[in-house]
Each structure stands twice: as structure tokens, then as C-alpha cells.
């Protein structure tokens, strides 16, 4: 791609036209299936507690907030969408902006378009099939392969992630020349994520999308624990051509359990010297009121468009990435 002046869009206009057509196709996909499009706030008084997510924040100083009210840019519309589900919305989707104060590069931009949808009464596998349908339609690709998190580790690293001790994980990391990181890392899930990123991701989803499901229960986040194997969570991720595309759950509906997970996250944040994040009590109240059993998924639209167009970088499918914003 030739160099352009900084005032110009980084993506060719032809790519932006194709992007618009893909967004229309996505909306048609959900309209044909009777899924309601919704809009929720991009700022909130509460935010995620996940130790791996870093939200932007600002201060509202308008009427009623003379001392300033901290607001967080949403890393995902999940919490608000679950409140809609608890209010009786039925199946819903949203395609809008999310924000993460993290990295920027070929596959990352701090402001990005997220497609998120929720299906009441769907189990994880039925939602995986619907995600697969969408990918085949937009990317014109083959149906995805599926493998469990455990199978992925055994196949590519010859180690069982559900039973391996930290010493075994460090040995596996050493074979990948990661000892400089692994030898000082005490968190087991961080070690697993390191091994997954370096030792598994590059080998899956090369020719067709790959669904990896049943992540360890310790990485459940907002997912239910499997009733068949309490070592794993009803959670899946989708990879294609070296890119993580989506993250889905059979959603946790127990407000007490969710509150305990939020509190545990904040304890981990304190241990790492990270700021405590305000827990979203509106979400907990919605769960207490009663959210229907459902499954949900978040998918990166910019990355999807990049794959559909055969682009090498998000800058080829975004008008103004952060370095031109």
C-alpha cells in the first residue's frame, strides 16, 4: 500500500465501500433470523474487573456532578445487553464501538467495532453453529473445525492444561524459548495463556476457522461452569489465519456467583498493583431479577472485514486508525 498524507484515510475508499457492504450483510443475517438490533451506552459508571482489560476513563462535570463523576468507556456492550435480556428483550445483537486502552498495531486499535449477540435458550454448541454460519456467509470459507482447549494443548504441546502443575507449564514454555517470561510468572492462567498464544494459536485455523471450547474453569469470566466436567467452563474462542475473531459463553445467570467472581478479580488486581474497578451492581441486580438461560458471543468486526478483504492490517479497513485519528 502506497504512503498517504496523514490527513487522508489509511484505507482505500474501495475497501471502505466493501466494508459498508459487509456491515449491511451482517445486519441482514440477523434480520432474517429475527434478532433485534439494540444500542447501549458507550460510557458507564462501572466497568470490567478482568485483570487483562484496561478501560479508558473520563470525568463528567455537568449538572448533578459538580465534583466530577468518573465514567468508563465500555470495553464491550455485554453488561448493558444482559440488562436488556433480563428485561425481556429476547434475542438481541449490537454492532458498535468498544474501547480498550491497550495496544495498537496490525490487529489492534484502541477504538474498534464489536459485534455482540445473545441467544436465549441456546446452548454453547448451538451458538457456535450460528457463528460458523455467519463466518461462512461473510468470508466464503469452509465450515469450522472444533476442538477442546485440552485437545489443542495435547495436540500441539503434548501437555494436559487441566492437570499440569506450574513446573510442567514452565518446562513447556522453555521448549518455546519463553523461560525469561515463564520462570518469574506465578499465575497459572497467565502461564497457560502464554503457552496458548505462542504454542497453539499459530497452528490452528489455518485453512478454515477453528473453534476452541471448554477453557479451564479458572478462566470462566462470565461463563457457566460445565455440568459435565467442573474443570472447564462453557466458553469458546474462534481463530482464523492467526487471528482471534470471537469469544463466546454460555452465560452465567447466578448473581451471587458473578459477584464473587468480580470480587476475586479485584483481589487479583490489588495483588498486581492495579487499580480496583467499580463493580456493576446494575448487572448483578438484573441477574438477581432473572436473566434467561442464554449464550452470547463478541466478534471483532474490523478483523472480520480484514479477513474478508485479504488485508494484512487493520489500517487497510479502517478510515482513521489511532495514528490518524
From Swiss-Prot:
Give the family per the record: Belongs to the class-II aminoacyl-tRNA synthetase family. EpmA subfamily.
Listed GO CC annotations: cytosol
Q: Which UniProt keywords apply?
A: ATP-binding, Ligase, Nucleotide-binding
Q: Which domain of life is it from?
A: Bacteria
For binding ATP, which residues are annotated in this chain's numbering? 100-102, 109, 244-245, 300
Mitochondrion listed as a keyword: no
Q: Which reaction does it catalyse?
A: D-beta-lysine + L-lysyl-[protein] + ATP = N(6)-((3R)-3,6-diaminohexanoyl)-L-lysyl-[protein] + AMP + diphosphate + H(+)
What's its EC? 6.3.2.-
| HAMAP family from the UniProt entry | EF_P_modif_A
Summarize the subunit comment: Homodimer.
Tell me which InterPro entries the record gives.
Answer: Aa-tRNA-synt_II, aa-tRNA-synth_II, aa-tRNA-synth_II/BPL/LPL, EpmA, Lys-tRNA-synth_II_C
Top-level taxonomy: Bacteria, Pseudomonadati, Pseudomonadota, Gammaproteobacteria, Enterobacterales
What is the purpose of this protein? With EpmB is involved in the beta-lysylation step of the post-translational modification of translation elongation factor P (EF-P). Catalyzes the ATP-dependent activation of (R)-beta-lysine produced by EpmB, forming a lysyl-adenylate, from which the beta-lysyl moiety is then transferred to the epsilon-amino group of a conserved specific lysine residue in EF-P.
Name the GO terms of the biological process aspect. lysyl-tRNA aminoacylation
GO molecular-function terms, A-Z: acid-ammonia (or amide) ligase activity; ATP binding; lysine-tRNA ligase activity; tRNA binding
Protein name, UniProt field? Elongation factor P--(R)-beta-lysine ligase
Please tell me where substrate binds in this chain: 76-78, 118, 251
